[in-house]
């Protein structure tokens, strides 16, 4: 199984699974975007065994390109692993203070952002397509952690995973307008094209939100 591993400390296990032609549906992990649910569940089970994480320890959401954030508690453990509709409803960012719970988001072109605070042990997983980005879900997640959980953004570690390449993400005027209306200067992340469209750096926009809040690692 192909994956990128991001480990900052021995007690943190984080990363991104990748396409793998040797596995069913190229290692697809998403129940909401698959041909056969059985293949996705087999892929999830293969990953769980490789990581020594039980299926009852995972928690997933029903992603809707929202700016909704959910704190995962022990009562949420196992939700969304085998049945998509049992996942956290209408949510695109998860975080938890619980140990031995795995959280994750599903992405292809969209930007995945993982956060870890080594001082509090809090972890977060954010799914940010362009809709989530213009709603500033990454900024809102960090702000919630600061205000509710008293996280110091200077302590946060951030990982921005694979997503659509900057030069491949062409957008029309409606999306251009929404990016320009964000709460910070986004000009460096838009390149106008002769056809009136633009290419947008979705990863860069999420990175800038982190930097604006004092997350620098």
Question: What feature does the model see in each segment?
Answer:
Residues 1-217:
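Active-site microenvironment for binding and transforming phosphate-containing groups
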């Amino acid at each position: 199984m192909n994956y990128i591993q991001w480990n900052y400390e021995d007690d943190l296990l984080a990363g991104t699974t990748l396409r793998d032609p040797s596995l069913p549906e190229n290692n697809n992990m998403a129940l909401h975007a698959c041909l056969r649910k059985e293949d996705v569940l087999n892929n999830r089970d293969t990953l769980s065994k490789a990581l020594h994480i039980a299926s009852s320890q995972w928690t997933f959401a029903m992603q809707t390109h929202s700016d909704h954030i959910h704190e995962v508690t022990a009562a949420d453990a196992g939700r969304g692993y085998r049945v998509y509709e049992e996942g956290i409803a209408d949510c695109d960012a998860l975080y938890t203070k619980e140990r031995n719970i795995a959280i994750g988001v599903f992405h292809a072109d969209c930007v995945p952002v993982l956060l870890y605070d080594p001082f509090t042990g809090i972890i977060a997983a954010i799914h940010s397509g362009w809709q989530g980005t213009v709603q500033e879900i990454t900024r809102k997640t960090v702000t919630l952690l600061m205000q509710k959980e008293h996280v110091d953004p200077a302590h946060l570690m951030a990982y921005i995973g694979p997503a659509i390449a900057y030069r491949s993400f062409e957008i029309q005027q409606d999306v251009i307008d929404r990016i320009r209306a964000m709460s910070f200067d986004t000009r460096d992340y838009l390149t106008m094209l002769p056809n009136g469209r633009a290419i947008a750096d979705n990863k860069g926009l999420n990175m800038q939100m982190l930097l604006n809040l004092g997350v620098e690692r």
